[in-house]
């Protein structure tokens, strides 16, 4: 390493080793060779056009392309950049950053490149009340924290933690994070669609099973609710007050007065739910359901469902689902997770009247967040479902 290159390799969060273009314009090479003066080390820059390998691959990874600029004109002298003695930016070069979700830890990504060391091997990403927060782990005890309010790259803030040495221009960080934001957006959309499809299948299957006891009207409405869930992509849930108002109309139906034996049986069914086991079942349905604290979310649904049946107060249950979205879970994933938990409730051995209550309440919870008209349809069939 040159004398200034060694310091840059240590102090530059997005440089080091053979990093081709995410670091300081000077790097770990020796002085004296020609280098392109393009604002990126050694002629590397982000691709302005989509590359054939850009985007998602079948293995779940995401590829971002950077390349050497053929039009860059080498200047004599100066720092040769992170690639040592190669200062000629005129030759065409293409590289890729590969980002792979870590399935063992929601929100963590493994970043790698087959040819060059990258800015960080691990990236943690989370959404907190509309703000994207990224932590780039560079070396033990050192990391770079990037905060992007409202996913607006122009509001980006970069903090260097336990960092010694000079800070560099954040332009290159911004360019990478803007690409990573695009990746995260596409990933969320894929996960939401996957979750909604899986949840709709579960609710439809539950409707078929309960329909054997509750009749064809219930089965048909349950399928309509399942279809509503499948097509919920990109939408927001109704507010707590709106959802509660719709649910109260169902609860006010005289047929929804639950007798003690049915209530005890339903509460006992919820008490049998093992949150960890159910979380494992749901998590195995696909990447979409691998959300943080899944077992805790299942346990909250279990506790607040029991509270609802025991006290008649269903507000805490609906507020729980709303809190997931406030905490950063995409609305479609929240609805899907809620539907999956409700669909996995063990119902064997329950009386038909208890099954009727569970069946009506399940589709009513879900529809109260999605469509007031669907809740009205549910209310209209209660007399034929619960006898």
Swiss-Prot record:
The chain crosses the membrane at residues 325-345, 350-370. Keywords: Antibiotic, Antimicrobial, Bacteriocin, Cell membrane, Membrane, Plasmid, Transmembrane, Transmembrane helix. SUPFAM superfamilies: Colicin. GO terms for molecular function: pore-forming activity; transmembrane transporter binding. The keyword Zinc does not apply. It is a multi-pass membrane protein. Coiled coil: none annotated. GO terms for biological process: defense response to Gram-negative bacterium; killing of cells of another organism; negative regulation of ion transmembrane transporter activity. Its main location: membrane. Residues 14-30, 78-87 have a biased composition (Gly residues). The keyword Heme does not apply. Residues 31-48 have a biased composition (Low complexity). It is found in: Cell membrane. It comes from the Bacteria. InterPro entries: Channel_colicin_C, Channel_colicin_C_sf. Residues 1-106 are annotated as: Disordered. GO terms for cellular component: plasma membrane. Residues 1-11 have a biased composition (Polar residues). This colicin is a channel-forming colicin. This class of transmembrane toxins depolarize the cytoplasmic membrane, leading to dissipation of cellular energy. Belongs to the channel forming colicin family. This is Colicin-N. It comes from Escherichia coli.
